[in-house]
Amino acid sequence: MIERIWSGRNALYLLLLPFSLFYGLISNFTRLSYRWGWRKAWRAPVPVVVVGNLTAGGNGKTPVVIWLVQALQQRGLRVGVVSRGYGGKAEYYPLVLGPKTTTDEAGDEPVLIYQRTGATVAVAPVRAQAVKAVLRSAAVDIIITDDGLQHYALARDIEIVVIDGERRFGNGWWLPAGPMRERAARLQSVTAIVTNGGKALPGEMAMRLTPGLAVNLKTGERRPVTELDNIVAMAGIGHPPRFFNTLRQLGVTPLRQVAFADHQHYSAESLYSLTSSGQTLLMTEKDAVKASAFAADNWWYLPVDASLPTAEAEALLATITATSAG
């Protein structure tokens, strides 16, 4: 229903417009209060790169963060990552992730980024506190903030916006009548625009999510996803249809598709009940970090990696590296 409202195909969005106008007023006031110096942003002693979006819902931001961290690490930079930690509830903040940190504490995306990159990752509701925690924990050359484009209390040097190329900006209205956190005109002031799927417009970098081999949650075994039998597919991400569409593009037709809310907590019982004897449960990597502690033998996940045009990616990385060197 919400997708239809946000796309403009359902007239119910008209009833929500008064709330959207209020949201837009607050959003604009917040941004301008920092721009005009009425409120002061905290600036870290190292460059800060924000990877965020203008819309609510899954746009493929986390794969971009992972790609960026790994690419900068390959260039010899020591990278720290900060996040709000959505879906997690730690006993204290800021929380610096370690090998035993759970998704219940830190949230699924920070744990996934930590596991994939090995970078120093910290979470806190106030991102400046997370940055300070990273700086106390490790020597870093640059900070990547996962989301937080609208968190203007943290000064930034580079802004990267990730767009869903299929859904774009829906009906263009602010939340809750539409999907927008900020209006599309905000793109005029960012460093780079990465478009996930669909058709990239001039000035945008076309990104594709490239699937890897399916991985068994319990054993770590890897095999082509087409070799798995009797698949029940599940996804608890911002936009589950993207995962299901990926499977279809790979030639996989699941027996059933189960969509969960983004950042939803799982229990062993709720996931064990999804399959019966002889069936395979296939999930996203983001789901896997939440389910690995109680995984069954027939549970697999499909990792994806962000792929960007080489020349444009190199130009962006050069800009970021130069900022770090300066």
Curated annotation (Swiss-Prot):
Keyword Aminoacyl-tRNA synthetase: no
Pathway in which this enzyme or protein is active: Glycolipid biosynthesis; lipid IV(A) biosynthesis; lipid IV(A) from (3R)-3-hydroxytetradecanoyl-[acyl-carrier-protein] and UDP-N-acetyl-alpha-D-glucosamine: step 6/6
Keywords attached to this entry: ATP-binding, Kinase, Lipid A biosynthesis, Lipid biosynthesis, Lipid metabolism, Nucleotide-binding, Transferase
Highest taxon listed in the record's lineage: Bacteria
Keyword match Plastid: no
GO MF entry, a single one: tetraacyldisaccharide 4'-kinase activity
Any one GO biological process: lipid A biosynthetic process
GO cellular component terms, semicolon-separated: plasma membrane
Annotated ATP binding sites: T55, A56, G57, G58, N59, G60, K61, T62
Catalyzed reactions: a lipid A disaccharide + ATP = a lipid IVA + ADP + H(+)
Annotated EC: 2.7.1.130
The protein's role, per its UniProt record: Transfers the gamma-phosphate of ATP to the 4'-position of a tetraacyldisaccharide 1-phosphate intermediate (termed DS-1-P) to form tetraacyldisaccharide 1,4'-bis-phosphate (lipid IVA).
The family this protein is said to belong to: Belongs to the LpxK family.
Protein name as catalogued: Tetraacyldisaccharide 4'-kinase
